[in-house]
């Protein structure tokens, strides 16, 4: 993988679209609304726990994991949502993983992929996702808004991912309610938790915010907890000897 990660993966996504059909929309899986849950449980830093076998930056993380068991451990440990990598080429994920996990837990599931088309959104919803990811850096603002509105029209919630102030302003502009701040630069792969801290000064009270990437310890959690409703954690949980203990370490009391 080159340092030009985002253009490379978006090119791959365009190629995948050629063979992707527009599925008929199936009933939405019933669970709670993530936005409402995060607003109601603001006294504790909530955990979005990720199931991922590999990543371009880390390589293989946990290829032999029982994905359903892992997800059920996350739910039992108190995770607010489970993020499921569905990209095959770069993250060794699969849309079937999302379906299997969504059918085995009762909490919201996030379709974690590089979504650039309505067909991907419908496919994710049909696989049980109740939340999808849209990345500001991956889409022109007009297209981002179109996909956001399309997903919302299907009853889905949308996690809109940002990395800098201009992207955060776009997220606010399109009406995003759930906004992620990725501490990882998708071009250079570099991770800096200060990204979350710097952008937090521009947050709005009517939104919820999730800090993503580079959070491994309770100390990391303490840095972002005053400003964020939740953190998205993948590698630290996939490599943990005891998932419940790790979630407890990260889900710190904000009171």
From Swiss-Prot:
It catalyses: 1-(2-carboxyphenylamino)-1-deoxy-D-ribulose 5-phosphate + H(+) = (1S,2R)-1-C-(indol-3-yl)glycerol 3-phosphate + CO2 + H2O. InterPro entries: Aldolase_TIM, Indole-3-glycerol_P_synth, Indole-3-glycerol_P_synth_dom, Indole-3-GlycerolPSynthase_CS, RibuloseP-bd_barrel. GO terms for biological process: L-tryptophan biosynthetic process. SUPFAM superfamilies: Ribulose-phoshate binding barrel. Pathway: Amino-acid biosynthesis; L-tryptophan biosynthesis; L-tryptophan from chorismate: step 4/5. Keywords: Amino-acid biosynthesis, Aromatic amino acid biosynthesis, Decarboxylase, Lyase, Tryptophan biosynthesis. GO terms for molecular function: indole-3-glycerol-phosphate synthase activity; phosphoribosylanthranilate isomerase activity. PANTHER family: INDOLE-3-GLYCEROL-PHOSPHATE SYNTHASE, TRYPTOPHAN BIOSYNTHESIS PROTEIN. This is Indole-3-glycerol phosphate synthase. It comes from Streptococcus mutans serotype c (strain ATCC 700610 / UA159). The gene is trpC.
């Amino acid at each position: 993988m080159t340092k030009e990660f985002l253009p490379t993966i978006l090119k791959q996504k365009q190629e995948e679209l050629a063979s992707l059909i527009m599925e008929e929309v199936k009933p939405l899986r019933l669970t709670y609304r993530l936005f409402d849950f995060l607003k109601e449980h603001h006294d504790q830093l909530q955990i979005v726990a990720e199931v991922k076998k590999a990543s371009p930056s880390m390589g293989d993380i946990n290829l032999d994991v029982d994905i359903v068991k892992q997800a059920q451990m996350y739910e039992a440990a108190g995770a607010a949502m489970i993020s499921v990598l569905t990209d095959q080429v770069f993250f060794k994920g699969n849309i079937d993983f999302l379906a299997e996990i969504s059918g085995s837990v009762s909490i919201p599931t996030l379709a974690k992929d590089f979504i650039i088309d309505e067909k991907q959104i419908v496919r994710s919803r049909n696989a049980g996702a109740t939340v999808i990811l849209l990345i500001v850096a991956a889409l022109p603002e007009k297209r981002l808004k179109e996909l956001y509105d399309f997903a919302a029209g299907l009853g889905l919630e949308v996690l809109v991912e940002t990395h800098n102030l201009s992207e955060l302003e776009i997220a606010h502009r399109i009406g995003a309610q759930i906004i992620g701040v990725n501490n990882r630069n998708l071009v250079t792969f570099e991770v800096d938790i200060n990204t979350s801290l710097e952008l937090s000064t521009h947050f709005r009270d009517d939104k919820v915010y999730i800090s993503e990437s580079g959070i491994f310890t309770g100390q990391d959690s303490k840095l972002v907890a005053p400003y964020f409703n939740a953190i998205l954690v993948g590698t630290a949980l996939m490599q943990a000897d005891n998932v419940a203990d790790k979630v407890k370490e990260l889900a710190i009391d904000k009171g």
